[in-house]
Amino acid sequence: MKEPRRVVVTGLGVVSPLGSDMDTFWKNVTDGVCGIGPITRFDTSQYKAKVAAEVKDFDPAQYLSTNELLRTDLYAQYAIGAAEQAVSESGIVGTLPPDRLGVYFGSGIGGLETVCSGVAKLNEQGPRRVSSLIIPMMIANMAAGLIAIRYDCQNGAMPAVTACATGSNAIGEAVRTIRHGYADAVIAGGSEASIVPLGVAGFVNMRALSTADDPMAASLPFDARRAGFVMGEGAGALVLEELEHARARGAHIYGEISGYGSTCDAYHMTASHPEGDGGRRAIAQALEESGYTGDERLYINAHGTGTPINDACETLAIKGALGQEKGREALVSSTKSMTGHMLGAAGAVEAIVCLKVLQTGIVPPTINLLEPDPECDLNHVAQTAVQAEIDLCLSNSLGFGGHNATLAFRKV
C-alpha cells in the first residue's frame, strides 16, 4: 500500500472583521484588536442582540464586475475575495491540468441575505417579481461553484455544510482528496454573511447570542461572565497542494496539514455532548494522524464561542484527548473573542491563524478574558499575544448537529 501523500498550504486569503487582507488581519489578531461593534446593517431597536463583528473594509468590486455583483450573494462575494487572494499568492493556476485542481468550499447557511430580500419582494410585490436568480444565489454550494468556474477547477467542486465546523471539514476533506491521489491541489475554505435580521432574530430567540451592549464585554470565551456568542462574518481560503508538487515549482509553503479528525456527537441538535466526547475523539484522531509524540509544544486555537456549555465541553474534550496534565500545558486561545463567530468561515480563518502561528511564533490572545472560569482550567493566552516556539497547532471546530472537526498543522 502506498504511503499517503503529504499536503501543504501554499496560499492564504481572508475577508474578516479584522481586515480583508492577510497583513491587516494578522496585525490586528496579534495586537488583540476587537472587531466587534454596533450592528450597522439594520435597525436593532427591537432586537436583544445589538452588536456583531461586521466586515468593514471589503470592496467586492476589487474582485467582481458590476454584472457579477448583481448575480452573487454577499457570502459568495466574500468567498471569491478570499479565494482570489489565496490563489494569487500561491500561483497554482496553470501549473497542473484543470482536472487535477479541485475546490472544497462551504458555508454554514448560504445566501441568507438573498433569502431575506427575496421573501420581502414576494410578500410586497407578488411571485412574479421574485428574481430568477434567487435559487442559485442562495444555495450554499454556489461559492464552490463560482470559485471552480473562475479558476477552471475541473477535479470537483464540493461544498461542506456542517454549520460551525464547515470551514474545517472543507479543509480536512480536501486534505484527504489530495492524500489519496484524487487531486494534486484544492482551493479550500468557508464563507458566511448572515448578519441580517432573520439570522440575528433566529440566534437570539434560541438564546445563543450575547445580548451585551458593550463590544468589549460581549464575546467572552472561557470567561466566567460569558453568556453567548457574537455573530461574525467573512471568509477564509487556503490553497492546499501535494508537497512534492509544491516543492517542484518552488512555491512558498506555510506549513503542512498533518492531521484531521471528524466525528459526530449524535446527541443533540445544538448542544455539544456534555462530556465533550465527540470533540475529544476528533482531537485524538488529528493527533494520531499527525504523529503526536506527547512531548511536543502545542498551541490550540479553540472553538471557544463564549457560550456557557460549549466552552466547558471543549475544555473536557481537550483534556480528554491530551490527558489532564498535557491538556493544561498546551497554549490555548480563542480568536472569536476578536472576530466574533464567523460560523461557516470560522474554521478556515482559524486554520489560517494556526499556520501564521507556526510561521511567526506569535500566539494571538483571547481578549477580555478577565475572570477565567475554573471549569475551563486551560493554559489560556489572555489579553496579549505571546512569543512561543510551537511544534504542533490544533484548530477545533464544533457545529450544530453535533459536527466536530479538528485540524493539525506542522512546519515542513
Q: Each predicted region: which residue ranges?
A:
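Condensing-enzyme catalytic core mediating Claisen C-C bond formation in acyl metabolism
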Residues: 6-10, 34-37, 214-292, 298-299
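Glycine-/small-residue-rich "gating" segment that lines the acyl/pantetheine channel
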Residues: 124-131, 172, 176, 192-248, ...
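Conserved beta-ketoacyl condensing-enzyme motif
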Residues: 9, 24-26, 30-162, 191-200, ...
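Active-site-proximal alpha-helical scaffold in enzymes
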Residues: 79-92, 140-192, 230-251, 341-363, ...
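Short, well-ordered amphipathic alpha-helical segments that serve as non-catalytic structural scaffolds
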Residues: 79-90, 143, 170, 241-243, ...
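ACP-dependent fatty acid/polyketide chain-elongation machinery
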Residues: 1-68, 244-254, 352-366, 410-412
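Short glycine/threonine-rich loop-to-helix capping motif typified by GTGT followed
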Residues: 267-279, 305-322, 342-349
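A glycine- and small-aliphatic-rich helix-loop capping segment at beta-alpha/alpha-beta transitions
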Residues: 23-30, 113-127, 177-180, 200-213, ...
